[in-house]
Amino acid sequence: MTKKLISSLLTLSLLWAVTSCTAQKQTHQNTVKVLTTTGDRLYDLSTYTTTLQKNNKNNNTPDITLMPNEKYQTIYGFGAAITGATCYNLMQMAPADRKAFLTTTFSETEGFGQNYVRVSIGCSDFSLSEYTLCDTKGIQNFALTNEEKNYLIPILQEILAINPKVQIIGSPWTAPRWMKVNNLTDLQPYNEWTSGQLNPAYYHDYALYFAKWLQAMKDNQINVEAITIQNEPLNRQNSASMYMGWDEQLAFIKNELGKTLRDKGFPNVKIYLFDHNYNYDNIESQKQYPIHIYKDPQASQYVAGTAFHNYGGTTSELSNIHNQFPDKELIFTESSIGKWNDGRNLKRRLTEDMEELGIKTLNNHCKAVIVWNLLLDEHGAPNRDKGCKTCFGAVDIQTSNYKTMQRNSHYYVISHLAAVIKQGATRIGIQNNTNNQILSTAFQNPDNTLALIVVNKNQQPTPLTVKHTNTYFTYQLPPNSVVSFLIPQN
């Protein structure tokens, strides 16, 4: 960011924070806080207010009616992946610029309050090299690498200093290669970064690998909220990967991982299954992946829920899983923009991505939404051979100065969600009387304020009337826009 851009960014986030405080202090004045972004960037996380009014009996039917007595899932948070590439780019920035960006992104009082991030356990396809944390055979050789020590941990510590409420979920892309075999029939050693399967003989060592990582992070004042067992377990490609069918994941959790985390002092770290696409990559034997594991009570006792990506299938699978096991959680852990989906075209991506990542995931019972890389350079880098060479970050940074930034759709989506939906919020009922060009989801925060997210897919300004018990407010939705409302206690 240039100094001018830094100043502008801070002004926007500070204005949002100040308006938020004002809205909270002036609830008797019925001030509704409004955050607006449009595809043409004329509104760019812009802050406004409107006013709650007493209902007039002559009013027409409201477009949206909020129903706080109808309650659904509790929300954990929203954020992006803090990959090795993200950390590298952040570390190239001047410290003051980096702090300004992280404050705008994560601070609850001076920014948008993003609060749930994903990190890789070992390398990902956006690391600086291929590696695990135990590349020398023998679990006693587990050790953090320079990528953790010099990049990931300092960045996480800086984020947590800004917002201690930020939660972290960790996911491995592969087990150490000495733990892998070519398949579970031949059991031949498989010294490759991609594909292969976990040798059942090393289930205990691999469970210890997770526990040692959790302890190493804790030793650096970083408490991890949750893990997934394998990133994209049905993907044999990428720069690092490992195939893990549902039967393998079941056996690993049931026989080793669950009790190992418990015995090593991490009984409260949540274990999420799967971490892959809604359509199970169209592999017939892997469909309903988490359901097979939930049906085994000895494995299921250790499992919090299931994580999904959206590179295949639809969000209807979320409700399909929820309806079968409503006590198990759902979280969304990865989506990327890139060349394939015109990722830097905000006019196209803004409303599409909020619909897909914000409205449909949350209305289908997700408790958290996390997108892929927070920050990549203008080339979508650093990245790895055989990994994604066409991905963009939620934010782009120019390598010419490591200052100039462009925020892309995923940054807007997550900021719009996190700014008004607080940790511990509960999704509430909503009656939407508009056409299918107006999409919405609503929540009650722990302080009893209400959060409403509205997507206007119309290409013209659209008047909106929202009813909340015996009050209502109006707002003119700009064309092709995403709007977040924070509504005071009634």
Task: Map each language-model feature to its residues.
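Substrate-binding and catalytic surfaces of secreted/luminal carbohydrate-active proteins
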Residues: H28-L45, T51-P62, I168-G170, A207-E225, ...
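N-terminal catalytic cores of secreted or lumenal carbohydrate-active enzymes
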Residues: L45-V224, G245, N255
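Ser/Thr-glycine-rich phosphate-binding loops at phosphate-binding pockets of nucleotides
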Residues: T228
